[in-house]
Amino acid sequence: MTYIQERGSTHVYHVNRMSKEEMDHMISLCVHEQPAYCVAACPFKMDTKEMLYYAAKGNFKKALAIYEKITPFPMILCDGCTAPCEDNCKLCELGDGVSIREVERAIVRYGEPGRRSSVFRMRKKKKAAIFGSGLFPLFLAGELEKKMYPTTIYCKEEDYESYIAAAAGHLLESDRSNEAKRLKSMDLSFEFGCSLNLSFIREKMELADVVCASEEVAKMLAPEEAADVEIMLREQAKIVSGPAESVMDAAFAAKRAALTVDLLVQNLSPHSNRGSEGAVTTKLYTNMEGIHGSNKIFCGQDGYSKEEAVEEAKRCIQCHCDECMKGCVYLSEYQKHPGLLAREIYNNTQIIMGDHPMNKPMNACALCGQCTVICPNGFDMSQVCKSARENMVSTDKMPLAPHEFALMDMLFSNSEAFLSRLQPGYETCRYVFFPGCQAGAIAPDVVMQAYEDLSNRVAGGVALMLGCCGAISEWAGRYEMTEKVNEQLKQELARLGDPIIIAGCPSCMKQLKESIGAHVIGIWEILREIGLPQQAKGLEIPVAIHDACGARGDAQTQDMIRQLLSDMGCIVEDTEYSRDLSPCCGYGGLTAYANKDMAAKMTEKCLERSDAPYITYCMACRDRFAREGRESRHILELLYGANASNMPDISEKRYNRLILKQTLLKNIWNEEPIMEKKDYTVAYTEEAIHMMDERMILKSDVERVLSDYRENQEAILDEETKELVTRSRLGNVTFWVRFVETEDGYLVHRAYSHRMNIMKRVGQ
């Protein structure tokens, strides 16, 4: 047996196979973090969705805190808000959108204003002066105070109440009083009752680093220059000013002006580094299937009561995109949208020294491609994880442990269990039957009957090749091993005369097409041409189809499988998430080896779609379903009337491959295989067999350990159980076996393994 050598952890191959640009492009396809439609329409980018979420729970304090993030004066803004968000509410497609503005007003009316933070904030050194009154100066004063600029306001008004009234005289007196209290609590300096003439203003301008003014004062200071509406600045006069037409315009202009102040004090261009201002276009996708329209709650002249506001807020459907997470166990288990998970996985690949916490999530993906089909933008999590695995391998940061057993199984399939023969009587063959490694491991009798049928009924000759297509090393990111498999398969195909491959597995079809560019067809295509075998018979009860991941995007194969089942008299029911949306059974991407719990949940997700027996056309799917106690059949079992063993363990799977090879050599090519015989027997308790299968310990591993024991006689006697314990290191793993000696050989009670090396002292 050839073992895979694990590279040293200190040796680094500086070959990065994942570029940041490619990852950024992929992450940009995920729309989960895109703003909701109402949020995108708001020039202030208020998180309307979150505000309505808290309002629906009756938590007006938190809802108000969200509203206060966008404006220093919520009563004034909500009174003059034109609610562009309402027209963009997704519910408008089904009826009435949410009355966001009225809910907003109720939040401001009933919500408890948050206390100003007691945390010390460092004031900026640069000073600002604001001349005049009105909506724009008021909002700007609040914005600059948030940014911690020492700000002085010069105005004609005599007190805070008058200053608020000059800006928002339309408010109720009680509301004006509340906003005046809010203004008074701010860290601002006011000089009331000023005579705002030119000499006074110019004198005070000398005391400030940045000058801001109402439009009226600005026109007096710079009558021939208008403010640039993009930056709210008269650039020649260096005066920040804004419009006073409406509450919304003034509040938005104040935000722009505050950013301009930031840039000016840093001696930067006021046109640069402004980011995205105002309303934006969102790429968010929200599936409205199953959502019903409703009428908005009637609102009287006095606005909503608390209870009415809560009911109206409850109508919000909290627009978001989690389509991929609904169908994918992997994403739903980690509770992270693909964009975030992909970013964390990419960052994991860039860690040079230390732990790599995202190795397990990276290896838990089934690489099935379901997310790509479901996502409206085609986000491919499988490509992210596959590239990350390759990157970790190429930089020598991927441990061998998660995938070693599967890789060793592939090497076994392509060495001891490998077979490549022309059909007797042919020098070259038109076809070669490639059933796949899992078919030979789980259903060897089916493989034999299928090959016998094909070789008898297909013109031009059908060769046979038993082996692995290389999908295992491809999934593991071990691209060098995949290249060796590809080279082996190419050489064998050339020796057979470059025949057309008849694949018995959709994953093999996909892998062989993509990796070696072979001409591959499915066995189902051939059987549709030549007709069903005589023994073909469907089940007499309705069955559910589970579509294989390898057939995703292959409508021809999906249709052909259904047609074959119909021809056999099967009553077929399609399930939710079928065809291209079909989930993975848990075997794909080597999830079953790297994360057994995740794989079990994937299998459960597949089986919960129907109570009927499952028909598959992937042998790995059929095996995983049978292990969960569900009646399942591979379509070839129905076509050839031969049932596979229900639950072959990992040792039986290898044994089945060897027996299949030896039987075919003997029966078809008249070659008598040489069988190695031992002069002792090894038996296993039921507990040992179950434990070995669970821990992926082969009988051949145990027998190698016992063979070493026979040579060195090294073992520990457990006085209590009278069992012997011996060990041996095979490849990268030390195996331990607990056994007793019998008359004929050994009885194994338990077996376990560790990735450790036992060192012996010299001379002891």
Label each residue range with its predicted role.
Residues 40-41, 127-151, 157, 286-342, ...:
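Conserved small-residue-rich
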Residues 531-542:
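Acyltransferase donor/substrate-recognition loop-hinge adjacent to the catalytic core
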Residues 545:
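Hydrophobic alpha-helical positions that pack around
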Residues 166-174, 438-525, 550-569, 573-663:
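Cofactor-cradling patches in redox/metallo enzymes
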Residues 36-39, 49-209, 335-504, 509-519, ...:
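Iron-sulfur-cluster electron-transfer modules
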